[in-house]
Amino acid sequence: MSKLYEWISPDSDVLEQEKTELRPPSMYKVVLNNDDYTPMEFVVEVLDKFFSMDLEKATQLMLTVHYEGKAVCGTFTAEVAETKVAQVNTYSRDNEHPLLCTMEQA
């Protein structure tokens, strides 16, 4: 009989494992902020490209950004939210638009 088998045999003493409480991850809202220079069409493009919104939903959210100053694009875990914020801000700068994307705790 192998030593490994003897070590895990039912007759051996088993240490009780400590139970850890699993909590859901903290969630963050990704927010688009209005500015006076970014074209509305570009905002719709960003919502389609980075948040997979259809034209109707992207247009509605773009109008919310325009009239209310900001709008939530989605709620994600911290890592996903950080990635989306960075992608949108980089894409906006690469296209010479001042569109600002931020995140805040949900």
From Swiss-Prot:
Family matches, as Pfam families: ClpS
GO BP, sorted A to Z: protein catabolic process; proteolysis
Coiled-coil segments: none
InterPro entries: ClpS, ClpS_core, Ribosomal_bL12_C/ClpS-like
NCBIfam families according to UniProt: PRK00033.1-3, PRK00033.1-5
Assembly and interaction partners: Binds to the N-terminal domain of the chaperone ClpA.
Family named by the database record: Belongs to the ClpS family.
Function: Involved in the modulation of the specificity of the ClpAP-mediated ATP-dependent protein degradation.
This protein's name: ATP-dependent Clp protease adapter protein ClpS
Native source species: Aliivibrio fischeri (strain ATCC 700601 / ES114)
Gene name in the database record: clpS
